[in-house]
Amino acid sequence: MVRNNSTSIVDRYQSELLQPQKEIVKRLRAFIARRYPELTESLKWHVPIYSLNGKNLLGLQDFTAHVNLNFFRGAQLHDPRRILIGKGKYVRHVTFRSVADIDCSALKGFIDQAIQPI
């Protein structure tokens, strides 16, 4: 993952979260950084956003009791197990209430699709 000043800002964002959101965000960020080094991490709209070639692909959003991983083109992703949540025109998300909810193999499939050209 491209490491820059934005990543330091995201580190600060993460440090201010409460548990379990802090640990969920930490694990998701580590997975994305390790598996998708080509993505750029930044803080936009007060949440971590991942982009490729200037196009926003993913976002982490914390809530009181969970964290969502948003896929900005989620409606276009192949999801036969119906893991993705949402009914809007474009965005879909996966909700994590604990680190035990993180299924890296399913996420890999969605992120692999998301980074493909439209």
PLM segments and residue spans:
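Charge-dense, helix-prone N-terminal extensions
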Residues: 1-118
